[in-house]
Regions:
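N-terminal helix-turn-helix DNA-binding module of bacterial transcription factors
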Residues: 1-60, 334-336
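Amphipathic helical "hinge" segments at domain boundaries
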Residues: 30, 38, 45-108, 118, ...
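Short beta-strand segments enriched in small/hydrophobic residues
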Residues: 17-20, 57-70, 178-188
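Bacterial carbohydrate/catabolite-sensing allosteric modules
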Residues: 86-90, 136-143, 147-336
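Short acidic/polar active-site loop segments enriched in Thr and Asp
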Residues: 14, 60, 117, 177-178, ...
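Short beta->alpha connector loops
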Residues: 100-104, 122-127, 248-250
């Protein structure tokens, strides 16, 4: 392993001069700095993270705060995490993943040390108890999600309210008059999780505008729950012809359940979803869907954080517009 003394010997300077070139703590001549940088490149030297943090008061580490609470769909969370880690490496930063439900205490524990330079916070609630602390920290943060009162924070997310509306509007254009939303697990709504609540708001408002009969059904993600919710929907809304699904693991089991109950997709029932594009496109019946742009959201969250670390102004709110892709799961409603 290359040491700082090897770099110093190669550049013809003292180890302390190499340290000053890395940290900028003391001025050195441009010619000396270039010799040191050339030696670092030639030898492939990488400063020890702890030493670099002590020298520069920076750790080059970002915290990704994503509590793995009940009802969270872990594969989607991991898509966000991979995007954050990959983008952070482009900026020579590593990522510390915090998954425990520790609330303010966990955030404060990390923020009060030199472990991380900045934070990305996920699984945002409408009335998120972490907001006062995030506003008071001397370290920058970005939230992937929008609380009810986002003033003074930097937030980015898919426009989930419009996403819910877009799905309903698509069904309405196809002539469907009775629609239902099969949503996230009940505990997600009990917590007031922002993205799930906004889908409900958009779905309900769009249905009301179009004069559609509508209902909302939170549902567990276990495959066995699909049959129960399908039976309940058909019992409570026998004229149902359009369904919006915001529960990725339930998509295929739900289509299977409807077909077992005698409804063909899309001949008898049109289904749309808000989910990752590869999920929608890869099912037995490809699903008309609004894509969940987890890779773009993770990438742009890191980019916002890097700009904040550099002292550059960033917008407080960034909402990505939803994009609906029509596939084989929706069709015009057959005339009664």
């Amino acid at each position: 392993m290359v040491k700082i003394t090897d770099v110093a010997r190669h550049a013809g300077v003292s180890p302390s001069t190499v340290s000053y070139a890395l940290s900028g703590k003391r001025p050195i001549s441009e010619e000396t700095r270039q010799r040191v940088e050339a030696a670092i490149r030639e030898l492939g030297y990488r400063p020890h993270a702890g030493a670099r943090a002590l020298a520069s008061s920076k750790s080059n580490v970002l915290a990704l705060v994503v509590p793995l609470r009940a009802g969270i769909h872990v594969p989607v969370v991991m898509q966000f995490a991979v995007s954050v880690v990959t983008t952070a490496r482009r900026y020579d930063h590593d990522v510390l993943l915090l998954t425990q439900e520790e609330g303010d205490d966990g955030l404060r524990r990390v923020a009060d040390t030199a472990l991380v330079d900045a934070l990305i916070v996920m699984d945002v609630q409408l009335q998120d108890p972490r907001l006062p602390l995030l506003r008071s920290l001397d370290r920058p943060s970005v939230m992937i999600g929008f609380p009810s009162e986002p003033a003074g924070l930097t937030c980015i997310d898919l426009d989930f309210k419009t996403a819910g509306a877009v799905c309903v509007e698509h069904l309405a254009r196809l002539g469907h008059r009775v629609v239902a939303l099969v949503g996230s697990p009940p505990e997600v709504y009990v917590r007031g999780t922002a993205f799930a609540q906004r889908v409900v708001q958009g779905f309900t408002a769009a249905a009301d505008r179009a004069g559609l009969a509508s209902s909302v059904h939170p549902c567990e993600s276990a495959p066995g729950a699909a049959r129960a919710v399908a039976e309940r929907l058909l019992r409570e809304q026998p004229a149902l012809t359009g369904v919006v699904v915001h529960n990725e693991p339930l998509l295929e089991p739900l289509i299977d359940a409807f077909e077992q109950l005698g409804l063909r997709v899309p001949a008898d029932l049109s289904v749309t979803a808000i989910c990752p594009e590869e999920t929608a496109a890869g099912l037995r019946v490809p699903i008309t869907s609004v894509a969940l742009p987890s890779a773009e959201l993770g990438e742009r969250a890191v980019e916002l954080l890097m700009r904040k670390l550099a002292g550059t102004d960033v917008p407080e709110a960034t909402l990505l517009p939803p994009r609906l892709t029509e596939r084989a799961s929706t069709a015009p409603r057959e005339a009664p």
